[in-house]
């Protein structure tokens, strides 16, 4: 199952088109590109084709609404060309019409929930990073009775070597990682293009950092200030005695990098009112958990993927190894308390 997902998703082909494409704006002002739509259409089309016997349910980020407007003909045409080129290079004879593309995108309209099986797709996670030429990920997971049982994370711009090393060794030039995990079977990483790498000729099992002293830990957070509260993560890091500056990268590549021990902690504290979506965390969550991490909200509760499209959680998402989690949780809760009731100065 995982194997055919690997061979079909070729994000680098999509990336080339992205560089020439217009970036559209969704109704919530967030960006979406032909690559987001193309990736969703492709993954949805292939999954449905490969799983004919199963009742197919896909919860995916994008929908075809804006593409059906009169002004979107050109963009739709580009997505169609991109998809047909990719299918042709994969030996597929069928040429898809514009309507086929829209239908494939809209296959991702399922609401998910606690019953049965649902695929969960973020066709391009970290679109802002993608547009900037930074990190992004293609994230696919499978829910079974509300639990994530499989996750695949393609990170086309992530170096195969650890990003913890600041010296730009030659292996930093080799980019493109594929992480995958199935429940109870660990997490594996291989090069995205299938080429051999001296460290990972085929696939290697990866593990999170075993650091026990928080002063030696480094932490990941979003690149985008709008996606997390830097002042809060700064306060948590100070309480833990973390010396290294934060590593700010886009997308679920953070979960992938964490799963192989490039850093020890991931902190995500969205601003008030933001509701996290399952496709932003499902694949990353199983990839990092199967590598030995604990993922929880600020109350210490595991993420619940059974509630539909949204994660219903108490403030924030935190990830680290089992040893560090109790210390991290205390630092998080102390910092949140202080942020909600800042200490008052002495009265005059
Ligand atoms: N205000 C906000 N707070 C937290 N996350 C947000 C946000 N606005 C958008 N996001 C989500 O953050 C994701 C990117 O996360 P990161 O900051 O780790 O790169 C986006 O995924 P997409 O790029 O798939 O839309 C989007 O779903
Ligand atoms: Mg988006
Ligand atoms: Mg996303
Ligand atoms: Mg996305």
Language-model features and meaning:
Residues 43, 142, 284-288:
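Buried hydrophobic packing segments
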Residues 1-124, 157-160, 192-195, 232-235, ...:
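N-terminal subdomain of lithium-sensitive/metallo-dependent phosphomonoesterases centered on the IMPase/IPPase/PAP
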Residues 13, 157-162, 166-348:
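An extended, acidic
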Residues 4, 57, 118, 139-141, ...:
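Residues embedded in well-ordered beta-strands
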Residues 99-106, 114-184:
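DPxDG-like acidic metal-binding loop motif
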Residues 31, 117-120, 150, 275, ...:
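Residue-level marker of motif borders
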């Amino acid at each position: 199952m995982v194997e055919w997902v690997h061979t079909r998703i070729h994000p680098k082909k999509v990336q080339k088109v992205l560089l020439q494409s217009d970036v559209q704006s969704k109704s919530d002002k967030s960006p979406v590109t032909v690559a987001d739509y193309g990736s969703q259409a492709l993954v949805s089309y292939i999954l449905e084709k490969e799983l004919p016997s199963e009742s197919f349910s896909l919860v995916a980020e994008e929908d075809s609404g804006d593409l059906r407007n009169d002004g979107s003909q050109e963009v739709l045409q580009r997505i169609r060309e991109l998809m047909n080129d990719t299918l042709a290079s994969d030996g597929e004879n069928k040429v898809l019409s514009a309507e086929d593309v829209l239908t494939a995108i809209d296959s991702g309209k399922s609401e998910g929930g606690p019953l049965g099986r649902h695929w969960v797709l973020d066709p391009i996670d970290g679109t802002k990073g993608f547009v900037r030429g930074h990190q992004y990920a293609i994230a696919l997971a499978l829910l079974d009775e509300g639990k994530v049982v499989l996750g695949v994370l393609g990170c086309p711009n992530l170096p195969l070597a650890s990003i913890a090393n600041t010296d730009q060794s030659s292996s930093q030039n080799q980019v493109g990682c594929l992480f995958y995990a199935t429940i109870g079977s660990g997490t594996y990483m291989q090069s995205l293009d299938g080429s051999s790498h001296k460290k990972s000729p085929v696939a290697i099992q990866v593990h999170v950092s075993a650091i026990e002293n928080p002063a030696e830990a480094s932490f990941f957070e979003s690149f985008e200030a709008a996606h997390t509260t830097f002042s809060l993560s700064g306060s948590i890091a100070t309480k833990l005695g973390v010396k290294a500056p934060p590593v700010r990268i886009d997308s679920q590549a953070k979960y992938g990098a964490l799963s192989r021990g490039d850093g020890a902690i991931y902190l995500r504290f969205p601003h008030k009112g933001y509701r996290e979506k399952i496709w932003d965390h499902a694949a990353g969550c199983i990839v990092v958990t199967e590598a030995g991490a604990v993922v929880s909200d600020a109350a210490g509760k595991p993420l619940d993927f059974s509630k539909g499209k949204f994660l219903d959680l108490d403030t924030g998402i935190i990830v680290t190894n089992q040893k560090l989690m109790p210390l991290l949780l205390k630092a998080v809760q102390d910092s949140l308390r202080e942020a909600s009731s800042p200490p008052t100065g002495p009265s005059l």
